[in-house]
């Protein structure tokens, strides 16, 4: 379901031409080529992203990709239309922010595998959102967990600290909602494309974040990507990367939360 009927102003990348941006976006659809391999290709082709996209098998091997990745890329590339993808984003008024744009969040840029492209619905404010804290926890929240989460989220919002979370049931939804109710900012990081809100029960909350002007939905996944289980660790690293710290208000011994807090500690900001 689309949540950006009345979005903030659409803008393409400020650092790339539309043709270049189309290829950057197209690469986000290629399974097996993430931020590290994409940077490898850009380095080899001297920032000529069109050359990287259209490279032959031998050139891709010389760039450092292994055989299975090359074969997979060539198969996926054959059914891709970079210009059409960009036109769809523009039609839906999705903001596209690349790692080279000034609008790209400064904290996120510091992590080792920062997303090359962010898809955004709503409003990111680079300066204000640099003061951000992640609030995460269980989906099966207790009355005490709700109370504590509301207390912290309200205090942070009133102190002009952006609340970052993952739009999940439980702690995430409470954190987002409380921040909005307190007049603060909140960023919801998704494990799917912007057109697939998960869980669907939080579609109203997602829409409120976008339409309020108090925050944004953010994802590295292109339109149409469903919330597969493997996407959640990637989502969590973005929550971590956007945040000055992570607050777990209530959680079982849950792998996802453990990975998220461990990921934050591994960043140089936690040194």
Label the model's feature ranges:
Residues 1-102:
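Short, small/acidic-rich helices and loops at N termini and domain boundaries
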Residues 1-20, 98-271:
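Glycine-biased, small-residue-rich flexible motifs in mid-sequence functional cores and linkers
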């Amino acid at each position: 379901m689309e949540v950006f009927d009345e979005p903030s102003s659409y803008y393409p990348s400020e650092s790339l031409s539309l043709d270049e941006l189309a290829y950057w976006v197209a690469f986000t659809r290629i399974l097996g080529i993430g931020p590290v391999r994409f940077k490898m290709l850009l380095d080899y082709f001297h920032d000529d992203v069109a050359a990287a996209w259209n490279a032959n098998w031998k050139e891709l091997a010389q760039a450092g990709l292994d055989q299975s990745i090359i074969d997979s890329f060539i198969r996926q590339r054959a059914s891709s239309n970079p210009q059409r993808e960009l036109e769809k984003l523009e039609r839906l008024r999705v903001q596209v922010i690349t790692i080279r744009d000034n609008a790209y969040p400064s904290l996120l840029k510091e992590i080792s595998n920062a997303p090359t492209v962010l898809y955004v619905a709503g409003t990111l404010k680079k300066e204000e959102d640099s003061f951000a804290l992640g609030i995460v926890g269980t989906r099966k929240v207790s009355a005490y967990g709700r109370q504590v989460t509301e207390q912290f989220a309200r205090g942070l919002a009133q102190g002009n600290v952006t609340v970052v979370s993952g739009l999940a049931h439980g702690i995430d939804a409470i954190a987002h909602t409380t921040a909005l109710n307190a007049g603060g900012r909140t960023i919801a990081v998704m494990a799917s494309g912007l057109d697939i809100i998960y869980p669907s029960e939080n579609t109203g909350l997602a829409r409120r974040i976008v339409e309020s002007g108090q925050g944004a939905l953010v994802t590295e996944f292109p339109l149409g990507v469903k919330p597969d289980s493997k996407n959640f660790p990637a989502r969590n690293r973005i929550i971590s990367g956007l945040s000055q710290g992570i607050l777990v208000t209530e959680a079982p011994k849950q792998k996802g939360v453990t990975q998220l807090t461990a990921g934050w500690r591994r960043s140089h900001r936690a040194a």
